[in-house]
């Protein structure tokens, strides 16, 4: 039987690893980002029956969202270098009854398919690429003529402050920024989407930006910040960054929530920048 997909593996550049805690963090983050990614997909013109490729699919959140939008007559392929995280994605799709998703262990640059896709999408992908222009070209070759290429990226260096000022929130956010500055391959990816698309020989992308904001006790931002710092702890250790004698990870999510609510503060997550182009 002829294989529908061909792939070779190469070394991963994902900075956060795929520990059980990190996979759980990805799932929580996926729920928080879902409305923004859905707006991107709808702006692109996602429709029933489409064939979609999800780059660096991780735990499968974007793949499952796309599968819901294209319906059972469509098809989704999610690729990732980590078989461990793909096993999680496969189980989640099975539990959700989304049988029109296929997950393939593959690197983006080596992946190929017998038929092109109506849409190729990636979320938080370009920030991990040392050669983002090459990745865009590789992704574009998988899109059918008239199809679309779309990316949802995070502006990592964006202000994630609190107003009024909450020292614990701001200190945690600064630690995360410091860790990412030394670990991400393409820290300014969200600021350079027009440049990257242009250098790849692609049409100028359509763009929009949204920012996550919270302040109430039920905001998902507390858990997101605490879990992200936990995943980055090995990187902080390698950088020999010591948070300080008074800083501890124990109960950080609850302490962030208590501090923000007590101060009646408004907290900000990083800007989410989305770009897409029809090819």
List where the protein language model places each region.
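A short SAM/SAH-binding and catalytic strip from SAM-dependent methyltransferases
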Residues: 118-133
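C-terminal helical/coil "lid" or tail adjacent to the Rossmann-like core of SAM-dependent
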Residues: 15, 21-22, 206-267
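A short glycine-rich, Lys/Arg-flanked "PGG" loop and its adjoining helix->strand segment in the class I
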Residues: 133-148
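N-terminal, positively charged/glycine-rich alpha-helical extensions of SAM-dependent methyltransferases
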Residues: 1-23, 27-28
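Conserved catalytic/acceptor-binding region of the Class I
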Residues: 150-219, 238
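Conserved alpha-helix/loop element of class I SAM-dependent methyltransferases that forms part
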Residues: 31-51, 65
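A short acidic, Gly/Pro-enriched loop at the edge of an enzyme's catalytic core
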Residues: 111-119
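Class I SAM-dependent methyltransferase SAM/SAH-binding core
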Residues: 53-55, 59-110
């Amino acid at each position: 039987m002829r294989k529908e997909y061909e792939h070779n593996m190469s070394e991963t550049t994902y900075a956060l690893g795929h520990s059980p805690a990190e996979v759980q963090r990805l799932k929580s983050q996926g729920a928080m980002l879902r409305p923004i990614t859905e707006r991107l997909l709808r702006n692109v013109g996602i429709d029933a029956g489409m064939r979609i490729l999800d780059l660096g699919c991780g735990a499968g959140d974007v793949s499952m969202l796309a599968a819901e939008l294209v319906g059972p007559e469509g098809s989704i392929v999610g690729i990732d270098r980590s078989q461990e995280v793909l096993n999680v994605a496969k189980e989640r799709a099975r539990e959700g009854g989304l049988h029109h998703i296929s997950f393939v262990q593959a690197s983006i640059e080596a992946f190929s398919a017998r038929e092109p896709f109506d849409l190729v999408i990636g979320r938080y992908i370009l920030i991990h690429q040392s050669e983002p222009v090459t990745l865009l070209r590789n992704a574009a070759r998988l899109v059918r003529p008239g199809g679309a290429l779309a990316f949802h990226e995070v502006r990592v260096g964006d202000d994630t402050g609190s107003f009024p000022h909450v020292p614990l929130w701001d200190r945690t956010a600064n630690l995360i920024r410091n860790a990412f500055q030394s670990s991400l391959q393409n820290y300014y990816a969200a600021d350079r989407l027009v440049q990257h698309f242009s250098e790849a020989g692609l049409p100028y992308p359509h763009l929009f930006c949204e920012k996550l904001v919270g302040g109430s006790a039920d905001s998902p931002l507390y858990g997101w910040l605490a879990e992200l710092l936990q995943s980055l702890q090995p990187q902080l250790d390698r950088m020999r960054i010591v948070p300080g004698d008074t800083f501890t990870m124990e109960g950080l999510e609850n302490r962030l929530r208590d501090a923000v609510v007590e101060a009646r503060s408004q907290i900000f997550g990083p800007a989410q920048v989305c770009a897409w182009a029809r090819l």
